[in-house]
Amino acid sequence: MVGEQPFLLGVNYWPRNKAMGWWSDFDAAEVRDEFTLIRSLGMSLVRIFLLWDDWQTSPDSVNRAALDNLGTVLDTSAELGLTLDVTFFTGHMSGPNWAPGWMLLPDEPLPPRVNQLVSGGEVVDCGYRNPYVDPVVLAASELLLKTVVAQYREHPAVGFWNLGNEPDLFAWPPAPAAGRAWVRRMTQVIRELDPIHQVTCGLHVDSLVHDNRLRVSDVFAETDFAAMHGYPMYVPWARDPLDVDFVP
């Protein structure tokens, strides 16, 4: 504890044997085994990701099986003394972007800066709706938040809610004001249901050195605390790919 701020040691989690196939091939025993290992290593926080493609196969519904499986993950975490960072809108993860089929725009090209797009388990080559301003995506996003937060806001394993994993890598807002408005809107939806747990949004170094219209100052003016992902292997000015001084 430094002052009033705890130092938490945690880990991003995907199952070792299936990675982003977790929610579509959920195994409660696997979660228990791996969370037991995480706890044995002295970690207390686990960040999990609600892969959008699995959680919302249509814009007007939330995958009930995934919702129930999240309850299993939370129960297991509580039993083991782990706290969860629950990350919504996981459209970007480990290279590819992952978009539900209803979000695709088949006649549009793949957006700039997107290396690969996966939907329904297949690599696709097309554009998709902008999550910051598209009314269909905004309504679906609010539905996902309301469903998950209402169901689990009182669960003891919930640590905080997270609006995304480096969301600028999935899409840029059309303007900085649109990016801030999106963060404000999503945060308000959560706070109306759950005034207790804090809200953050996982950004990365590119947000510090480039204007991707999802500005750090705007994001953290609307959320409760800053979350920054530092990867020295992605910047030319780090001393080496594992530069220990890159993130103090």
PLM feature segments, named:
Residues M1-F225, G230, V235-W237, V244:
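Active-site mouth of glycoside hydrolases
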